[in-house]
Amino acid sequence: MPKVFTSETQKTGEIGENVAVKFLMKHSFAILDRNYTKKWGEIDIVAEKDDKLYFIEVKSVSRETLSSVTHETLDQYNPEENMHPWKLKRMARTIQTYLLSKNLDEKEWQVDLLVVFLDLKGKNAKIKVVKDIIL
């Protein structure tokens, strides 16, 4: 059954996550999980490469959304700034739950952020990778 989107933001987020998965697979990551959810948080993508786990947060923004950002602030527009301290704390708890539930608490891991800039009309995307975010 296809996913039903309740908002344009959710649709953009889902497309961005799909683009992120393709990007990771192209760069030799194995995708282990998507949208791992607990009541206290969510992990967008869990991937593995070279025997290391990667917990990936995806932030997506469409060109249509960017058109509402003024020219003066566009150069400084950083969706990664939406990684608020409370979000990081919730993510840390969710990661610990994931590791324990999968018996992976001894495995090396890191948190990365993929910022996906979408041009939905042109069907293009640019990806910015922010590696090893400190929780």
Predicted features and spans:
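Short acidic/glycine-enriched loop/turn segments that link adjacent beta-strands
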Residues: K38-G41
